[in-house]
Regions:
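Short, ordered, surface-exposed loop/turn motifs in non-cytosolic proteins
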Residues: 195-197
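Glycine-rich phosphate/pyrophosphate-handling loop used in enzymes and phosphotransfer proteins
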Residues: 1-188, 192
């Protein structure tokens, strides 16, 4: 009886807070329905997914082939200039809303797991920030996305397998592929090479 009462109080309190401080979709600004996180169902349906996980030799894989050992690579959605969906990454990266990374990581994992994308993957290694940027931001958005993926897949996250040795200025003027190349090939260095070979 006490548990039921506690549950009802939590539900009532949550509903009251929603009236005062409604949770809104980070893309369109509409109030989120019960069970929705971060983005509403309409925006989730309209999310410009790449579906690269369904294509061998996709642009992300091609970018990294021959540069380091790689089995599979993908990106969840397109980052297009002028798109409202850019808010997701902007709030995650610069808005202090690290939880968005975990939520989007879970969304991504739920979709990718059905395709077998994660089969044979032993560890998730988020691309690190330089320690200076980590201190400024307070968190690594890549790590939070990895945590969300791990929550669905059960694959462990290793935040110490790779370190960033070189500090770079903002990469906002570079294409996504130029950013990945800088991050993965020129700046980051494995601390345990056998783990990622």
């Amino acid at each position: 009886m006490i548990m039921k009462h506690t549950f009802l109080v939590k539900e009532w309190f949550g509903a009251f807070l929603s009236l005062l401080f409604p949770r809104c979709c980070v893309v369109c600004g509409r109030p989120l329905a019960k069970g929705e996180e971060c983005i509403c169902a309409v925006c989730n349906m309209d999310l410009p997914r790449t579906d690269y996980h369904l294509r061998r030799d996709n642009p992300v894989e091609l970018l990294f082939w021959g540069k380091f050992p790689l089995e599979r690579a993908t990106s969840f959605f397109y980052y297009r200039k002028g798109s409202d969906f850019r808010r997701i990454l902007h709030l995650l990266k610069y808005g202090g809303q690290k939880e968005i990374g975990a939520i989007m990581g879970r969304y991504m994992a739920v979709e990718l797991i059905e395709s077998g994308f994660f089969q044979g993957i032993d560890v998730i290694i988020p691309i690190p920030l330089h320690e200076t940027k980590q201190r400024i931001r307070g968190y690594n958005q890549s790590e939070w996305i990895a945590r969300g993926i791990a929550a669905v897949t059960g694959i462990p996250v290793d935040t110490e397998a790779v370190v960033r040795r070189k500090y770079t200025e903002t990469q906002t003027r570079k294409s996504i592929f130029e950013r990945w190349e800088l991050s993965l090939i020129h700046i980051s260095e494995p601390t345990r090479p056998r783990l990622i070979s």
